[in-house]
Amino acid sequence: MERPRLAPRGRAIGVAAAAGLAAAMGVGRFVFTPLLPIMTASTGLGAGDGAVIATGNYAGYLVGALLLTRLPQLSRRGTFLAWSLVLIASEAAMAASAQVAVYTALRFAAGVASAAIFIACASTVSRHRAEGASLGVAFAGVGSGIAVTGLFTLLAGPHLSWQGLWIGSAVLTALLLAPAWLLDIRPEIGTDVTGSRPAPGPRERRAWLLLLGAYFAEGVGYIIVGTFLVAAVAGPDTTAATGPALWLVVGLAAAPATVAWHAVARRFGTGRALVAALTVQAVGVAAPALHDGLVAALISALAFGGTFMGVVVLAIDLGNRLPVARPAATLTTLYAIGQVIGPLLVVPVLGSSFTGAFAIAAMIVAVAAALAAGATRAAAPS
């Protein structure tokens, strides 16, 4: 039987949303990762400073997600344009300062705007799924955006100052957001499913608590890698192109990851796929902690890029299968809190090497895998 094709309108919505997510997440949220070592070399910014600045962005994302959850009317076409301008302006303004406090405030603003854009794009695709809009296509935008930032830094890095790279990132964000401005953004209408689902029994409650713990731990662990992977390979034994090229690998691995892990879930089950993704990520994150070298960093980039978005989709899917209220919102909130904690957690071990930070991240992600395995067993029919 011939597989159904995406309707042209649905396909266009998915692609436009993917461009928006590439701007909001791939550039707006993660461009600091390849730019951090360049700023460190040019301004003397320390690894601890980088952790604080990154935490500002993740805290902003948490605030933005909570804000849009409480006030969904802030997600409309007009406010979407305003959030876009905030994101673009916050990136461009990074070039005009040399103060950690200012950088942190600007990254906080970018985090709030990124969350608003992410929610608007994702909810728009969900609303049009019957027309063929695909969340898999939309979420591929995150990895594509990361790849774009890696390629941009790789090509423009030798020719632009760090200030020029931030301004270029703002221009790149504007270009990627342009298709998303055509989307029909409307407030997401949420429903409390408590009354429509049976009350969870002891096994379901145990599965839910274990899944919450796993997803929180993943938020703490993965973001350590997402913040410091490029900075970790900067040194006398590598060239200026090594870090951006590594970040490009992360993006290329992330782009097809959600579709790939969805296929694994259909074959082996959502819970088993989640455990597998977390296990692969833990092993990959441990590689730079066990061996200083480009091969270990490449393994980490492939494993990290190939799993972190897959974990998001699989964890939320598993949560949606449990008889609990608002699983996606609760999981996303805990994940965002974990991201705020992650960079600050490793500040005491940051120094001339990132080995300690990656070792901590690997152990935390391994704990997430163990908790996810427990959740999968508890959620299985008895």
Predicted segments with their positions:
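Extracytoplasmic gate region of multi-pass secondary transporters
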Residues: 33, 207-248, 255
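Helix-to-loop junctions at the C-terminal end of transmembrane segments
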Residues: 64-76, 257-270, 350
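Helix-loop-helix hairpin linking two adjacent transmembrane segments in secondary transporters
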Residues: 100, 131, 136-185
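Cytoplasmic helix-loop-helix junction between adjacent transmembrane helices
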Residues: 106-142
